[in-house]
UniProtKB/Swiss-Prot annotation:
Biological role stated in the UniProt entry: Catalyzes the transfer of a two-carbon ketol group from a ketose donor to an aldose acceptor, via a covalent intermediate with the cofactor thiamine pyrophosphate.
Protein name: Transketolase
Record: residues binding thiamine diphosphate: 40, 77, 123-125, 156, 185, 244, 258, 392, 428
Modified residues (Phosphotyrosine): 275
Amino acid sequence: MESYHKPDQQKLQALKDTANRLRISSIQATTAAGSGHPTSCCSAAEIMAVLFFHTMRYKSQDPRNPHNDRFVLSKGHAAPILYAVWAEAGFLAEAELLNLRKISSDLDGHPVPKQAFTDVATGSLGQGLGAACGMAYTGKYFDKASYRVYCLLGDGELSEGSVWEAMAFASIYKLDNLVAILDINRLGQSDPAPLQHQMDIYQKRCEAFGWHAIIVDGHSVEELCKAFGQAKHQPTAIIAKTFKGRGITGVEDKESWHGKPLPKNMAEQIIQEIYSQIQSKKKILATPPQEDAPSVDIANIRMPSLPSYKVGDKIATRKAYGQALAKLGHASDRIIALDGDTKNSTFSEIFKKEHPDRFIECYIAEQNMVSIAVGCATRNRTVPFCSTFAAFFTRAFDQIRMAAISESNINLCGSHCGVSIGEDGPSQMALEDLAMFRSVPTSTVFYPSDGVATEKAVELAANTKGICFIRTSRPENAIIYNNNEDFQVGQAKVVLKSKDDQVTVIGAGVTLHEALAAAELLKKEKINIRVLDPFTIKPLDRKLILDSARATKGRILTVEDHYYEGGIGEAVSSAVVGEPGITVTHLAVNRVPRSGKPAELLKMFGIDRDAIAQAVRGLITKA
């Protein structure tokens, strides 16, 4: 970064005037909406003015230009001042600000990416810095470009552990292109923030996490200009002492005003007071960026060759995932992998070995890992694949939920699903993950049952919009598909069929192989079953399931290494509900499990081949 050059008095006054216009716009918009957070906006007015009209480099009419500096408003409830900034910059019409929070407007109560100037949705506090870290990592290590990343946080969200996961990450990877601005306005939503204005403690905490930390008067444009101009070979935290509701007489630094717009008469009076302080209506033009970000194309990334498995050979789908991802990495240098210190279990270590510069170790911080991936994926710069035990993704559910709201394209691979992992016990067993991922808007849920299907799932996920989840298993199972088998999202496979099938059995992963073993047992009794592999649990192949059910006297049996709630059984039941003559019977894990050998646990919880065979017999006997 350039060394600091103090702005002249004319520029400093122009920044003060800009800050006050931003205050006025925030008050007007929230009063017109009848809701919103004007006091949270007013504490950040000088910060936003200096950032956007002195420090940042961007094209004001092209907010998502890849060369632009990035900005993340982690304290998303201050959205009105972000909108005011883009009106001040000339991208939004001033009149549009008065449509804040209306159903007809794109100016939601918190930032969302239908706004061209918003890369990631915020509002669930504590997540913005992680996304900013992903952007900064991408800028420094993948794009090798000069754009910088700025993230504005509130002091309330500094109680979130995910913030400190991100602080640690930025320090470990020396993200000297990242600046976090802490808006220390003293007051939270219902009470003062725990440290209030103990600025030295904030500084010590940031420094302890390896950041260069600068305390400033957050309402002094001169101090802010100087702080933003201080370059260090480490991430920088600007700790700004501010006052909530700054400039609003009778409200500034007062409790009980969070999330409350000013009444109309009061707003008019306050606006007049603030307006009287503005010396010039002249607006400051944005400074254009240095154009050195490379062109990137992540469309239609394909495997360089077909799978190379042999039918009957055994491999765990978790290992097949690692091999597939490493292989796909040769097709595009924008495929990246992230892991939460489980790479020797998820087998993402294979990717690391072949593409070390594109592997990001996120350590045991799953929430931050998801946020990093979201940041890396912004502006279509990379195609991220995150991996950890599927059980540990449940810790990051809010980040995953917000990724969907962010319209992010990220891929998550969860290994060690179900009781079939064996001796490690219930804390490591993912038994809720299908329910979680199925509930996420924009999600696609892959559940491959062999190495070939896993490789195809990885390739499809890389080219599928939204949140993709790939569920992989620990046990080794046989390859059942030929290498040239075609797989598509939403298309199931009939793995076993005959003209005399009496029950359609649907399983995935380990339970698909148990279903095939059950078919062999039943064949000795002259009972034939049709076995379906759904491949994707969301979307589900409703047509094939219905056709198969009708061909087997309307009988469907689902079997899954997952709890009853929200898994394959409920997905299938939802797909066929209302269809006459069709019944669905479920086999699933019905209680908290325990340690044991995989085969023992499958038997204990009634999802092994014997349980499937017994259930089939029962269905036939009922007829």
